[in-house]
């Protein structure tokens, strides 16, 4: 049963108060599984559904609504982040993941630094760095070869390349 449908009949309904909430168990599971499969394709869709559940909680009573005003706004902003955080915890050992939400969330403030020591990537195994068999000082340093004969680029093409106006 969706949070904004109600089969109960109530005689007095106060529309001005926050009676429903997006942070209901059903909507939490919905956002949790939707955000675990979340990508850039479903980002706009989940953001649109945030507004649906938010306004449904504001405008109508809900049999599953258990939070009031402040936690309604809290759930509205934090539900999708919690779902993405549980998805991103599986891939924290790879720093090459494209913009994980925990990194965006914790590095958004300029005064805050990302706690690298508390994530799994800090204890990831380090790969050995390949070194040359001999130090670089013993390797022959060849100078860059210079052309000594033949027409230069300006003489060959005239005032400029034919495809580039000079």
UniProtKB/Swiss-Prot annotation:
It is a multi-pass membrane protein. It comes from the Eukaryota. It is found in: Membrane. The chain crosses the membrane at residues 15-35, 41-61, 63-83. Its main location: membrane. Glycans are attached at residue 7. Keywords: Glycoprotein, Membrane, Transmembrane, Transmembrane helix. GO terms for cellular component: membrane. Residues 127-166 are annotated as: Disordered. This is Putative transmembrane protein encoded by LINC00477. It comes from Homo sapiens. The lineage of its organism: Eukaryota, Metazoa, Chordata, Craniata, Vertebrata.
């Amino acid at each position: 049963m969706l949070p904004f449908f109600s089969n109960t009949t109530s005689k007095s309904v106060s529309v001005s108060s926050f009676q429903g909430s997006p942070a209901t168990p059903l909507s939490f599971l919905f956002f949790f599984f939707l955000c675990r499969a979340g990508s850039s394709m479903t980002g706009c869709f989940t953001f649109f559904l945030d507004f649906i559940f938010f306004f449904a909680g504001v405008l109508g009573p809900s049999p599953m609504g258990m939070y009031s005003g402040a936690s309604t706004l809290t759930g509205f902003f934090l539900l999708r982040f919690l779902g993405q955080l549980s998805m991103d915890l599986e891939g924290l050992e790879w720093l090459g993941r494209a913009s994980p939400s925990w990194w965006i969330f914790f590095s958004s403030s300029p005064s805050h630094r990302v706690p690298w020591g508390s994530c799994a990537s800090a204890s990831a195994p380090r790969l050995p760095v390949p070194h040359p068999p001999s130090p670089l000082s013993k390797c022959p340093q060849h100078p860059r070869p210079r052309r000594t004969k033949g027409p230069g680029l300006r003489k060959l093409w005239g005032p400029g390349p034919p495809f580039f106006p000079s």
